[in-house]
Amino acid sequence: MKRRQFLSRVTGATASVVALAQQRSLARIQAEAAASSGAAIKIDPAPRFEISPHLYMQFMEPLGVTDPSVEAAWDYETDNWRKDFIETTRDLAPGMMRFGGLVSRYYKWREGVGPPSKRPLYRNYVWGGKETHRVGAHEFVDFCGRVGAESLYCVNFVGDGDKRYAKTREGDRTGDAREAADWVSYANDPEHAERKANGASNPLKIQFWQLGNETSYGNACFKKEEAIKTTIDFAKAMRERDRTIKLIGWGDSGWAGDLIDRAGEHIDYVAVHMMGQTPLSSDTVLRGNRYQSDPERAWNELMGLIGPRIERKLLELEDSLAKHQSKHGIAITEGHLSLAPHNSNPILTEWLTGVYHARVMNLYQRHGATVKIATAADFNGTRWTTNALIHQVPGGVSYLLPSGTVMRLFKRHNGTHGVSVESKPSNLDLAASRTGDKIFLHVANMNYSGASEATFAVNGMTVTSGRVVEISSEDPRQQISPLNPTVFAPQEHSLPQAEVLRWRFPARSVSVVELDCRKAS
């Protein structure tokens, strides 16, 4: 070996040793700072579970005259989806799009395929008015493909047992297991003649199907035993047509354990809805416009809802599944903050609700070992403030309400695996994840009036740099509307370089912190 080569290799090896020593020293400094500080975010980077790509899903339902959702999203001039609607939804980046809800009790899928001019109108019994069927299975699947979402359909589950829909003036609007199985064949059989005749030579590839929607709610639908038997009948019939499909059974209202015991082998997920996100106090300011005179009290009420209204239900469901030795994923296919007036309280257009929705999605992600499908809002419409996305009518802009803005931020900046938060400032609500050597922190500052500062440390790793993608507003009552559709656009900041990186989270802010790390040894 030549002397120059020898010196070069020795120098390189020495530099590597020095760099490694510096990394270990810096990791130790960061760990010591975390141990001595009451304001440290300390992460255990060991992967705990894989984060589902469907965790941030959305839910589309034709809502008749109540809120023209699907109809208002279709541009009849171009005979296509509205361009602004597609662009805003693509930016929202839902991993899954569900079509159904209460409308599935009288939805007849075959009426929505074939030439649009020949598709019949149908009455929307729950939400009023009539639907045109201009958006059927082909158009919905096309929409999902254009926005990058997996398709999920609710089948007509014999009208969920509600006999009203078997005897309407328009005839029997319920659907049986054969009808659902025929839908699976139409969608997924590569050689299906009817689908090909309707212009789709390739399968629609609908892999996810929900059996039952709010079947356990009220007294008009199936009782538990009948619902479970019907679930088995549907699952068998549908899987005879395509064994690769994923099926979601209804397990809310304490039904999950018995559903798993009797039908567990036939389904892949257990569905619940996180409804009932209602005020705890009868003297609430979260009713009508009362919050406007005392926004801080409204904030405090919102912060107090998540434990008793959402977390308790989730923990009870997880406990039930564990007792029945179930490995089925949880599918929270609907759920939103429910305030008077029904689904239209203006507070949901204001940043007062941003942190609330961030905490809800953080809760679901922290439970990502079991929660595989989830949302924090309805999806689209023109009037309901429980939506994630609003579109002007008859045309104009589409924009995201605070719930949608938060889901967009967290979905677009997230890791592949959940990791643990060992310590954090008490004012911050966190969910942490990891992809390779990058750590992602979803942070909601629960402090109404003050900023919260934090340092960062990762066990066994050195945090070398990072950035913050942040949504904040000086005005807690900042409202979004067609006049300011980008008011909640996230702002990006680099973390200031230092041995110990730190950030000051503004009051009421929602942020993602991305930490670039290196192994310390």
Where are these regions (language model features)?
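N-terminal export signals
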Residues: 5-27
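Short Pro-Gly-centered flexible turn/kink motifs
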Residues: 503-515
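Acidic, Ser/Thr/Pro-rich beta/coil linker or hinge segments at domain junctions
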Residues: 461-505
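Aromatic/acidic polysaccharide-binding cleft in carbohydrate-active enzymes
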Residues: 331-408, 414, 418-430
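Noncatalytic carbohydrate-binding groove/subsite architecture in carbohydrate-active enzymes
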Residues: 224-354
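N-terminal catalytic cores of secreted or lumenal carbohydrate-active enzymes
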Residues: 35-284
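Carbohydrate-binding surface patches
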Residues: 427-462, 468-471, 511-514
